[in-house]
C-alpha cells in the first residue's frame, strides 16, 4: 500500500508535467496569459458560458456551444491557433464530525485505506489534461486524461466526441419554418453529453474528495459505467425548443478497460446493448429560462465481469427541471431538480452472495439545489438530497449475509464559492480559479438516524484550470 507521502510525490510529478506543457503554450501567447482552450477558440471569457465563471454549470450560451459540438469559433491571434489543450488541478482539506476508521490488521473494514489519517486529510484530488475544442470542421471533442490522487491512478476520464450541424426548413421550398441543430455524440459515460446540470455527470456538487464518507447508494446511471462503456447517441434540437436524443451503450473489452486505467472487482460488463434516451423542452422568456425533461436507460449488467450467476437488470427513469434567472448577470438565481427511479433485479448479485430472496428491488434518488451568484464571482448554493430504496444484504469476509440494510439517507449541502478570474474585466481573465467552502449535514445515513451526524463533513476546495 502506498503512503499519502508517496502519492503526493507522484501527484506533484504529474502536476509538474501539466504545468510544463502549459508553460510551452503560455510562452507563445502575448502577455503570457494562461488560456483555457474553449476561451481561446471562441474569443469569449469563461463567464459567457458558465454562470459562476468556472465549473460545469452552464449558461444558455454554454449549452448552445456544447450542442453545436464544441466547434464554435470567434477567437483570433496566436491564442486561437494553439492546440485545444488545457490542464486542471483540484485539492481539498476534509474534516468529519467524527474520525473515520483507517484500515489495519485490527480494522480490516476501515472506511479509509491505510496510510491516511482518521480526520483532517489534505488530498490532491485530481490533475487532468484535456483536449477540448474543435478537431476538424464540424467535429469537436471534450476528452480528459486524469490522475486520481486519492486512488493513485491514471485513467481515461470523461470523453465526448461530436459531429454537429444545422438545417433550416425555411431555406427549402417546404411550407415550414423549423430550425434543426443535429448531431452525433460518441462518449464513454451516460449523461456526459447532456446539456443540463441536472443529470448525474454534471450535477451539483461539482467538487468532492475521496476521503469524505460514502453514504447511501447511487443508481447505475450515476457514474457506475464511467469510462467502462462506449456509446453513440443521435440528437436534435428543434426550434431551440424541443430536444430529442437516443442511442445505446456497450462495454469495452477487459483489456481496453485496463488500458484506460479501469481495474478492480467493481468493474462491470454490459450483456448486450443498453439503450439510452433523452427528451427535454426549453424556453427563455426575457431572461427567465425554463427546462423540463426526462431521461433513462435500460441495462443488463454482469457484475465484476463474472457471468457465473447471470446478470443484474436495471431500468433507470428520471425527470428533471431547471430554472435560471439570467436577465441581470449581476444577480443570477437558479433552481435545479431531478428524481431518478431505478427498478432492479439483482439475481446475479444475490446468487453470488447466497441470498435466496427473489423479486425486484428499487432505488429512488431525489436532488434539489438552489443557487445565487453575484457578479458571476461569489456564489451560494444550498442542496437537498434524499435516497430511498429496498433492503440490501451486508456480507462478511466470506460472502455470507450477516445483516440487511436500507440505503435510505437524507442530507443537505451548503457551499460558498469565490471565482476571482474568468471575466472580461478580470486580471488574467482567461485563466481560472475556483475556491469553495462546503458543508454536508446528515439527518439520516444508510437507513438509520442514529449517529448520522457523525458523517457531517466540512471541506475546503481549490480548483485551478490553465
Model-found features: residue ranges?
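Outer membrane beta-barrel
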Residues: 58-59, 89-96, 103-104, 116-254, ...
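Outer-membrane beta-barrel "beta-signal"
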Residues: 45, 414-420, 454-466
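Transmembrane beta-barrel outer-membrane domains
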Residues: 80-82, 120-124, 152-156, 223-227, ...
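Outer-membrane beta-barrel translocator domains and adjoining extracellular loop/strand segments
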Residues: 97-105, 153-158, 195-201, 255-266, ...
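C-terminal segment of classical bacterial N-terminal signal peptides
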Residues: 21-31
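The canonical Cys-X-X-Cys-His
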Residues: 43-53
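Detector for outer-membrane/organellar transmembrane beta-barrel domains
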Residues: 287-420
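N-terminal secretory signal peptides that target proteins for export/translocation
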Residues: 1-11
Amino acid at each position: 500500500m502506498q503512503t499519502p507521502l508517496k502519492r503526493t510525490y507522484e501527484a506533484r510529478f504529474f502536476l509538474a508535467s501539466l504545468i510544463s506543457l502549459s508553460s510551452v503554450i503560455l510562452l507563445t501567447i502575448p502577455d503570457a496569459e494562461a488560456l483555457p482552450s474553449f476561451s481561446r477558440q471562441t474569443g469569449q471569457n469563461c463567464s459567457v458560458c458558465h454562470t459562476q465563471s468556472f465549473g460545469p454549470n452552464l449558461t444558455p450560451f454554454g449549452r448552445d456551444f456544447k450542442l453545436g459540438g464544441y466547434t464554435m469559433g470567434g477567437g483570433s491571434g496566436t491564442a486561437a491557433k494553439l492546440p485545444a489543450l488545457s490542464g486542471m488541478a483540484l485539492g481539498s482539506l476534509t474534516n468529519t464530525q467524527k474520525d473515520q476508521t483507517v484500515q489495519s490488521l485490527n480494522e480490516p473494514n476501515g472506511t479509509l485505506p491505510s496510510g491516511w489519517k482518521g480526520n483532517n486529510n489534505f488530498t490532491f484530488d485530481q490533475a487532468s489534461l484535456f483536449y477540448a475544442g474543435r478537431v476538424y470542421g464540424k467535429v469537436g471533442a471534450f476528452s480528459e486524461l486524469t490522475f486520481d490522487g486519492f486512488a493513485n491512478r491514471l485513467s481515461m476520464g470523461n470523453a465526448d466526441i461530436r459531429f454537429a450541424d444545422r438545417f433550416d426548413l425555411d431555406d427549402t421550398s417546404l411550407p415550414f419554418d423549423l430550425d434543426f441543430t443535429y448531431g452525433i455524440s460518441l462518449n464513454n459515460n451516460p449523461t456526459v453529453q447532456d446539456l443540463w446540470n441536472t443529470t448525474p455527470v454534471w450535477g451539483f456538487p461539482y467538487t468532492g474528495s475521496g476521503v469524505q464518507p460514502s453514504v447511501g447508494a447511487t443508481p447505475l446511471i450515476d457514474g457506475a459505467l464511467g469510462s467502462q462503456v462506449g456509446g453513440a447517441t443521435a440528437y436534435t434540437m428543434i426550434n431551440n425548443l424541443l430536444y430529442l436524443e437516443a442511442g445505446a451503450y456497450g462495454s469495452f473489452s477487459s483489456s481496453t478497460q485496463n488500458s484506460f486505467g479501469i481495474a478492480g472487482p467493481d468493474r462491470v460488463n454490459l450483456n448486450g446493448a443498453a439503450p439510452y434516451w433523452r427528451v427535454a423542452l426549453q424556453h427563455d422568456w426575457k431572461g427567465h429560462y425554463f427546462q423540463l425533461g426526462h431521461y433513462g436507460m435500460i441495462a443488463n449488467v454482469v457484475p465484476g465481469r463474472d457471468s457465473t450467476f447471470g446478470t443484474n437488470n436495471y431500468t433507470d427513469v428520471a425527470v428533471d427541471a431547471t430554472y435560471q434567472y439570467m436577465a441581470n448577470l449581476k444577480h443570477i438565481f437558479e433552481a435545479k431538480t431531478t428524481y431518478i427511479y431505478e427498478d432492479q433485479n439483482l439475481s446475479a448479485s444475490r446468487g453470488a452472495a447466497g441470498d435466496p430472496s427473489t423479486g425486484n428491488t428499487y432505488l429512488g434518488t431525489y436532488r434539489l439545489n438552489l443557487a445565487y451568484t453575484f457578479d458571476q464571482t461569489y456564489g451560494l448554493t444550498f442542496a437537498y438530497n434524499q435516497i430511498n430504496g429496498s433492503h440490501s444484504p451486508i456480507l462478511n469476509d466470506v460472502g455470507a449475509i450477516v445483516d440487511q440494510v436500507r440505503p435510505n439517507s437524507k442530507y443537505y449541502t451548503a457551499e460558498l464559492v469565490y471565482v476571482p478570474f474568468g471575466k472580461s474585466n478580470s486580471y488574467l481573465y482567461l485563466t481560472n480559479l475556483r475556491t469553495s467552502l462546503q458543508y454536508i449535514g446528515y439527518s439520516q445515513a444508510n437507513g438509520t438516524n442514529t449517529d448520522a451526524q457523525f458523517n457531517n463533513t466540512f471541506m475546503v476546495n481549490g480548483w485551478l484550470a490553465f
